[in-house]
Amino acid sequence: MIRAALVLICFAGAAMASEDIPDKYPQSVLYNKPVEVIPHVFTAIGATAPPTYENAGHNNNLSFIVTGDGVIVVNSGASYRLAEALHAEIRAVTDQPVRIVVNENGQGHAMLGNNYWIGQGVPVLGHVDAAAEFEKSAGQSLASLQNYARENAEGTVPMGPTETFTDRHVIEMGGVTVEVLYLGPAHSPGDTQVWIPEWSMMIAGDIAFHERMLPLFDNTCTSCWIETWDTAFAPLNPTWIIPGHGHPTSLAQVTRYTRDYLLDLREKIAVHLDEGGDLTGAYYVDQSRWSHLDTFDELATRNAGMVFAEMEFE
């Protein structure tokens, strides 16, 4: 535990914004080399930036758990090549085979690498809602990947998970109990968390953001996200959190940059609505408190418009 605490202290001290760093691991298609967060749990930290040619779409966290009888991977990555590169890093750490891949949601950067793992004979698990979302959006996600990643998109063929779950799927492997959870509505349909109670480690997926501004989608319910956080996610009280985006950190930090941001934006939009404000004015509500976050310039006004549309008829 002392080692893990030191790791997180190092992350906190070195967690400079990576939005302006095109690539931290140029010898690999991965943006970052995987690091061991606590013993047996590794993550390759993605760029806190939009997907680009330089980061090859590795802008989320790709994690893996090494047990005594195999490896559990969380996220297949945004492409065949990213999945292949992560597998090479896993092989450098352990001789244990990959037994299962868990997709954290139905977005391209979680599922577009599935065909690599399926080709390796590895089962891929995803939430039923995430699988349905990917089925609808896979073509657009692939086209986007091909546009920005160019040759790094080669080999990628959209494939959904081979197995689905609804609320909870327990993996017993090598003396470790891993709970794959759907705690409730959050960032996108089927957002999934991977919880290791014995180690108090949460691989949170996109329910939790750190260091970058979270994006809101047309199907994001911010009030639901806050409720899921307060009633299901926070009560688990994990010591260690690997968020969907950003460096591993604490519950307090992801609460600040996820739940507290959502509450603050909803409060600002509520005041704007009470004063008779319209959509155009909503784009200019004061979000300066969050201006230090990566992707603020790309997302702040868009998020304000999304919350206005959500709250206008609440």
Predicted ranges, named:
Residues 164-197:
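Core dinuclear metal-dependent hydrolase active-site scaffold
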Residues 38-89, 194-196, 200-205:
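Conserved beta-strand hairpin/beta-sheet module of binuclear metal-dependent hydrolase folds
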Residues 88-163, 167-170, 189:
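Active-site HxH/HxHxD metal-binding segment of metal-dependent hydrolases
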Residues 28, 274-314:
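C-terminal regulatory/interaction regions
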Residues 12-14:
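N-terminal signal peptide c-region/cleavage motif recognized by signal peptidases
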Residues 1-8:
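Sec-dependent signal peptide recognition
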Residues 195, 223-281:
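Divalent-metal (often Zn2+) His-rich catalytic cores of metallo-beta-lactamase-fold enzymes
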Residues 74-76, 99-106, 125-128, 183, ...:
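Active-site neighborhood of phospho(di)ester-bond hydrolases with catalytic His/Asp-centered motifs
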